[in-house]
Amino acid sequence: MIPDDVATELGRVVRRWQQLPLDRAAERVVGVHELMAQLAGEPLPDLGPAVVMDQLRVVVFDACRVEGGPPHLAEQLASLRLGWA
């Protein structure tokens, strides 16, 4: 269902997010919401940094249900993660 490259990068994003201090995660949640809104086609509720990775997983799964999924999704996830360095 989820292409291997997307699943790998999503796992990396989630692991990196779990390593971020709460204040840094709170500062970066906006970027996650921007990507989710792009994938979902509408803004999603802000449930805070503790839940945003669960939201991202669901949105990525739903986006990949369409044949082939969004182009360059793995690269978008990598860019998001690398922006937290």
Describe each model-derived feature in a short phrase.
Residues M1-A37, A74, L80-R81:
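Short terminal alpha-helical segments
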Residues L22-V29, P45-P49, V66, P70:
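Alpha-helical rod/repeat scaffolding segments in eukaryotic adaptors/tethers
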Residues D54-A85:
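Amphipathic alpha-helical binding modules
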Residues I2, G41, P45, G69-L73:
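Generic structural signal for short, flexible, solvent-exposed coil/loop and linker residues
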Residues P43-V59:
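Short, charged early-sequence alpha-helical segments and their helix-coil boundaries
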